[in-house]
Amino acid sequence: MATLRQVFSISELRQKIFFTFSLLALCRIGVFIPVPGINGDRAVAYFNQLLGSSQNLFQLADIFSGGAFAQMTVIALGVVPYISASIIVQLLVVFMPTLQREMREAPDQGKRKLGRMTRLFTLLLACVQSLLFAKFALRMNLVVPGIVLPAMLSLKLFGIPCVFYLTTVVVMTTGTLLLMWIGEQISDKGIGNGISLIITLGMLASFPSVLGSIFNKLNLGSQDPSEFGIVSLLVLCAVFVFVLMATVLIIEGVRKVPVQHARRIIGRREVLGGGSYLPLKVNYAGVIPVIFASSLLMFPATIGQFLSSESSWLKRIATMLSPGSVVYSIFYVLLIIFFTYFWTATQFRPEQIASEMKKNGAFIPGIRQGKPTQSYLEYTMNRVTLLGAVFLAVVAILPSILGRILRVDANVSYFLGGTAMLIVVGVVLDTMKQIDAFLLVRRYDGVLKKDRPKGRR
């Protein structure tokens, strides 16, 4: 209670929190606004039947969108196009020397340029996905011309309902762009990472349905190991606790590199250098690799699923990339490891750290300053990142294993077993750290209470 009073006693922090929650509430309103021309009840019934059948791609998409996908609403695409666009732009930076040079010479201008490129790619990807979404809705007979704008939605050109396609593309693309704008506003003026908070909000919104699935499937009196009984429930709870602890451990874990400071002369006095350490995070990328890997696999799989009835090879691709399959699991693990290294390489700057240490007279015992320090930091970070990447992949892949062993619905295993839990816990910890830093600047005890010297009030 004392911490909450501290949080809300600071006017600026209180305004940031209120601003963040207000925009997140606006996101949830979009879940209840259907795409014009689509029968919402028929769509929900169809997806309920589909989602209850097996571990399907649409289950993961529905969790990411907070239930908007199954209801076919204006924000059904969620922020997946934005995340895919961010991946494309980050890869372009790596493979285009001109962008790298611009980022080094004018970081602010480079960031603005990357932001414009990300928005452009988001627009293009959202248009493509919403077009496929409209085609899928027509094929599944989920469109009822006459629900909204009866005259316009019934118009056809060469037998193709062009107005319906145009309406769906405009509405759903606008929904994605609105979510992107909200995420950027939260990151700039609120608390936490806006896009990550939107994803987390959608996942938390599916928690009641997860609990409902557990209790509907639970059969306490059954002795059949193939049914979901008390033993399966206890195993599920144990896995939930393990994933929770492992997530906190992997996100908060650091490798402490000892640092010694040289003697300095201040005025006429010689001050002895003290010892400290440089913390290298075990998982420097946080939950970014999980979000990137899930979104990247979701994009081609969604296209294959939408067009599977028109091509046998697309149907095979959709089946292979369906969550829970062996191919999906292999790609998922490899992508998590790749994006962990990729994000660490783009964000961790050993040459800058080595340069700052040399300027401040700091050194690592047994390692010369300058280039040797940079090489040592790169070597150490690569080893630490490997451990973090493998651990992250193991925790993230638990849902498919859990679903097969315990025979629970995919939404339960996704939420309690790995992917969703990693994202939710990681984003919550990151947001708490931002609030903690905000409080410490003003000499308050942080939200994440640790033993630390207190400043004067």
UniProtKB/Swiss-Prot annotation:
Function, in words: The central subunit of the protein translocation channel SecYEG. Consists of two halves formed by TMs 1-5 and 6-10. These two domains form a lateral gate at the front which open onto the bilayer between TMs 2 and 7, and are clamped together by SecE at the back. The channel is closed by both a pore ring composed of hydrophobic SecY resides and a short helix (helix 2A) on the extracellular side of the membrane which forms a plug. The plug probably moves laterally to allow the channel to open. The ring and the pore may move independently.
GO annotations of cellular component type: plasma membrane
Topology relative to the membrane: Multi-pass membrane protein
Claim: Transmembrane helix is one of the keywords in the record: yes
Membrane-spanning parts: 17-37, 75-95, 120-140, 163-183, 195-215, 230-250, 287-307, 326-346, 386-406, 412-432
Keywords: Cell inner membrane, Cell membrane, Membrane, Protein transport, Translocation, Transmembrane, Transmembrane helix, Transport
Pfam family for this entry, one: SecY
Subunit composition and interactions: Component of the Sec protein translocase complex. Heterotrimer consisting of SecY, SecE and SecG subunits. The heterotrimers can form oligomers, although 1 heterotrimer is thought to be able to translocate proteins. Interacts with the ribosome. Interacts with SecDF, and other proteins may be involved. Interacts with SecA.
Organism field: Chlamydia muridarum (strain MoPn / Nigg)
KW Amino-acid biosynthesis (keyword) present: no
Phylogenetic classification of the source organism: Bacteria, Pseudomonadati, Chlamydiota, Chlamydiia, Chlamydiales
InterPro entries to which the protein is assigned, alphabetical: SecY, SecY/SEC61-alpha, SecY_CS, SecY_dom_sf
Domain of life of the native organism: Bacteria
Protein name: Protein translocase subunit SecY
